[in-house]
Amino acid sequence: MCVLWAIMSSDAAMSIRLPPECETALLERFLKAEAMALWTVRSARLQDVPPNVYTFLRKHEEDERGHLAQFETMVGHQSRERERLPTVPRQWPALAVQLYGYEALGLEFAKLLAAMRPDLASILVDEETHVGFFEREIQ
């Protein structure tokens, strides 16, 4: 059984270490999160967004596609293909908040993953970039 132990401060988790037996579960979760992010970004690109956002989303989609392929190889199966793209807000401010929420979740998974698998630290850097972009957009 995979059990999460954390030393908590008043603000947030100071240190989270997952035992090695959690690796498969974490990789499976990250695969699902990356698939969700990829489909949401694809749907977002079809909306009326500012030009700088469209450029970022195009690069972001490439990043997510690469992460997804990497995780599919690691877990030994492909993520489930969606028949249609998810519905996302049409107004950019609401869409930015939705994307920020998904990316913030992905960042938390990436932190856990990088602590367990330092060889995957580049994914953490990508997630920090994505979160940073959407943080700036919603401020």
Annotate each predicted stretch with a short phrase.
Residues 2-139:
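Non-heme di-metal
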